[in-house]
């Protein structure tokens, strides 16, 4: 005959707080004083306050090198010891007019400019006057670019066309210059021409508005 286990061992312990009261313990322990409304009002509460302070990050001593080679030191938060500035006021044509690296040199290694001029001419070039040395160098570069893989007759023809276009452009500039000088000499002539271009001839002189209106209706 098997023995029966007690039921208290098989019962799962509960997570809820026990409701059993111990009268002997509660009687011997003094009860805490209850907090009244008057006591809650009289108690002072001090909360923490934020005190604003200036942020002072750590700064490093940095050496700044400009494009012309000059250097100076600054205090900055960047930890880099040497900073090479590529954009500064000294890297400008007005500050360094004799610097060769700042000159606008035309590089046509792929031959795109030569192909454009061959198709559309030199009317899109800048109006800056070229020195004889630059003109000779441009003519030599054009001949070298046109002669590569092209017969000599074609290169000579292109050179002749370029010379003709340059001559025509020069003549147009001279004509425009003469016209501007003529306008500066007598500005009233140009104003008179402008007014006369918009003026209309009066076909019925000596008639007022009413007579002019009925002039065409007379038989």
Swiss-Prot record:
| InterPro entries in the cross-refs | Ribosomal_bL31m, Ribosomal_bL31m_N
Q: Does the keyword ATP-binding apply?
A: no
Protein task: Component of the mitochondrial ribosome (mitoribosome), a dedicated translation machinery responsible for the synthesis of mitochondrial genome-encoded proteins, including at least some of the essential transmembrane subunits of the mitochondrial respiratory chain. The mitoribosomes are attached to the mitochondrial inner membrane and translation products are cotranslationally integrated into the membrane.
Subunit comment: Component of the mitochondrial large ribosomal subunit (mt-LSU). Mature N.crassa 74S mitochondrial ribosomes consist of a small (37S) and a large (54S) subunit. The 37S small subunit contains a 16S ribosomal RNA (16S mt-rRNA) and 32 different proteins. The 54S large subunit contains a 23S rRNA (23S mt-rRNA) and 42 different proteins. bL31m bridges the mt-LSU central protuberance and the mt-SSU head.
Q: Where in the cell is it found?
A: Mitochondrion
Q: Name one GO molecular function term.
A: structural constituent of ribosome
Q: Which UniProt keywords apply?
A: Mitochondrion
Q: Where is this region: Disordered?
A: 169-188, 200-219
| Superkingdom of source | Eukaryota
- UniProt cross-references to Pfam families, sorted A to Z: bL31_N (PF21492)
Taxonomic lineage of this organism? Answer: Eukaryota, Fungi, Dikarya, Ascomycota, Pezizomycotina
**Full protein name:** Large ribosomal subunit protein bL31m
Residue ranges under compositional bias (Basic and acidic residues)? 169-181, 210-219
Gene Ontology cellular-component annotations: mitochondrial large ribosomal subunit
Annotated GO biological processes are: mitochondrial translation
Predominant place of localization: mitochondrion
Family statement drawn from the similarity comment of this UniProt entry: Belongs to the bacterial ribosomal protein bL31 family. Highly divergent.
